[in-house]
């Protein structure tokens, strides 16, 4: 809290949780307080237009232990959570705020549960815009890249007119970033591995959510 200058005002860990007559894992919950200086500087995560640049902030190491991918696909619940580098956490977050305050981003989303591909899908839901993502040349494992839950990462939608100013801020702050692709109309596309109609993706999500 002191390092991030972030006030946590409450917390709880319930060890006796039950949902639908089934036990669930212990669930830590914290409550924090933040201050938005100007409401017109708030930012949501919905894509706004096509042909925007998609900037990935933070390094991807492909951490899959304790990930949603391991839980849902392989029913693996063991392992260590991803490490958190507080310096990167603070610097990356403050750089994202600087970009937002300078009106350079059209949408922003943190990368957490589910990894990169889930964050991109959530940005596409309820819009007509999908993505066209290029795989890194040095990629060793597509699942680690798409579903890894490495911390301190963000996806920014940046218009071409604002790209140079955005990159200048990131370079001045010594932030690791990659331009991983663009937004496009109608389709959610990851290299040659995945191509799905946005409407179909939204329907699949609704079916899951309504039965959750």
Regions found by a protein language model. Name each.
Residues 1-65, 179-182:
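Glycine-rich anion-binding loops of enzyme active sites
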Residues 4, 9-28, 78, 101-212:
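Glycine-/charge-enriched secondary-structure boundary and capping motifs
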Residues 27, 66-83:
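Gly-rich Lys/Arg/Thr-decorated short loops/hinges at beta-loop-alpha junctions or inter-strand turns
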Residues 31-37, 83-93, 133-140:
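A general structural motif
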Residues 46, 85, 109:
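Glycine- and other small-residue-rich loops at beta-strand/loop junctions that grip anionic moieties
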Residues 54-61, 78-87, 127-129:
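Phosphate-binding glycine-rich loops and adjacent basic patches that engage nucleotide phosphates
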Residues 65-66, 166:
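Short glycine-/acidic-enriched loop or helix-start segments at secondary-structure transitions
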Residues 97:
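Histidine/acidic residue-rich metal-binding segments in metalloenzymes
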């Amino acid at each position: 809290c002191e390092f991030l200058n972030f006030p946590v005002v409450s917390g709880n860990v319930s060890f006796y949780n039950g949902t639908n007559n089934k036990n669930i894992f212990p669930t830590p919950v914290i409550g924090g307080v933040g201050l938005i200086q100007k409401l017109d500087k708030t930012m949501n995560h919905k894509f706004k237009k096509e042909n925007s640049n998609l900037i990935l902030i933070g390094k991807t190491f492909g951490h899959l232990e304790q990930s949603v991918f391991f839980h849902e696909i392989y029913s693996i619940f063991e392992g260590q959570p991803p490490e958190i580098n507080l310096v990167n956490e603070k610097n990356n977050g403050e750089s994202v705020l600087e970009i937002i305050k300078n009106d350079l981003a059209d949408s922003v989303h943190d990368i957490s549960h589910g990894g990169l591909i889930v964050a991109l899908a959530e940005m596409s839901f309820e819009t007509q815009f999908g993505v066209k993502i290029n795989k890194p040349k040095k990629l060793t494992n597509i699942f680690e890249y798409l579903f890894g839950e490495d911390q301190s990462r963000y996806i920014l939608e940046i218009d071409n007119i604002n790209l140079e100013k955005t990159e200048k801020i990131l370079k001045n702050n010594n932030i690791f970033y990659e331009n991983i692709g663009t937004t496009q109309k109608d389709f959610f596309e990851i290299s040659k591995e995945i191509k799905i109609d946005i409407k179909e993706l939204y329907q699949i999500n609704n079916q899951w959510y309504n039965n959750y």
